[in-house]
Amino acid sequence: MAHPTQLGFQDAASPVMEELLHFHDHALMIVFLISTLVLYIIIAMVSTKLTNKYILDSQEIEIVWTILPAVILVLIALPSLRILYLMDEINDPHLTIKAMGHQWYWSYEYTDYENLGFDSYMVPTQDLAPGQFRLLETDHRMVVPMESPVRILVSAEDVLHSWAVPSLGVKMDAVPGRLNQTAFIASRPGVFYGQCSEICGANHSFMPIVVEAVPLEHFENWSSLMLEDA
């Protein structure tokens, strides 16, 4: 969950998000080292009037500043490609949920069950209970079992939307007439908040997403109650 004055990412709640955080730190360190080197060179050039005649036409320097950027790009590209393939990998999902974007709410359908689905609307500010978050709470949460692969099928009924939950490392575009898919594994129990991440009209800011990860037995009890009420 994000909080005021936060400078970093939200706490990771899935293996993919943990990998993304590690890659961010890895890339940021490379950027920091390059920036430090460039700043040192600029300060050295400005602070002295002396000129080294041996570097005016140095083949060694030409070789270094050609090879070094190539090595840096490889060091960034390899972990990036690894995470890219991890995000696209969907192996034997235990649960499949279809998320449909509407103006301006989400609807969810648990395709492994015969009649388990619901619409999820934002809770108005005046109806919030103590401790709930403004513009982030919904009347129905998307409940998933923790430590289980969950596949999300994402589409839209009207215009472009985007289903995104930062703590889970998930962001998938919802395109009318197209079915996109992604997957995640919630590594710990908790309530994780997200929002529509594609401008979709006047009430774009009022399309929150709430994912609640619970132990498997709690999920089975919840699904049984939902099926009884259907």
Swiss-Prot record:
Keywords: Copper, Electron transport, Magnesium, Membrane, Metal-binding, Mitochondrion, Mitochondrion inner membrane, Respiratory chain, Translocase, Transmembrane, Transmembrane helix, Transport. It is found in: Mitochondrion inner membrane. GO terms for biological process: ATP synthesis coupled electron transport. It is a multi-pass membrane protein. Residues 46-59 are mitochondrial matrix. InterPro entries: CcO_II, CcO_II-like_C, CcO_II_C, Copper_CuA, Cupredoxin, Cyt_c_oxidase_su2, Cyt_c_oxidase_su2_TM_dom, Cyt_c_oxidase_su2_TM_sf. The chain crosses the membrane at residues 15-45, 60-87. Binds a dinuclear copper A center per subunit. Mg(2+) binds at E198. Its main location: mitochondrion. Cu cation A2 binds at C196, E198, C200, H204. Signal peptide: none annotated. One of its GO terms (molecular function) is copper ion binding. GO terms for cellular component: mitochondrial inner membrane; respiratory chain complex IV. Its cofactor is Cu cation. Component of the cytochrome c oxidase (complex IV, CIV), a multisubunit enzyme composed of 14 subunits. The complex is composed of a catalytic core of 3 subunits MT-CO1, MT-CO2 and MT-CO3, encoded in the mitochondrial DNA, and 11 supernumerary subunits COX4I, COX5A, COX5B, COX6A, COX6B, COX6C, COX7A, COX7B, COX7C, COX8 and NDUFA4, which are encoded in the nuclear genome. Component of the cytochrome c oxidase, the last enzyme in the mitochondrial electron transport chain which drives oxidative phosphorylation. The respiratory chain contains 3 multisubunit complexes succinate dehydrogenase (complex II, CII), ubiquinol-cytochrome c oxidoreductase (cytochrome b-c1 complex, complex III, CIII) and cytochrome c oxidase (complex IV, CIV), that cooperate to transfer electrons derived from NADH and succinate to molecular oxygen, creating an electrochemical gradient over the inner membrane that drives transmembrane transport and the ATP synthase. PANTHER family: CYTOCHROME C OXIDASE SUBUNIT 2, CYTOCHROME C OXIDASE, SUBUNIT II. Belongs to the cytochrome c oxidase subunit 2 family. This is Cytochrome c oxidase subunit 2. It comes from Carassius auratus. The gene is mt-co2.
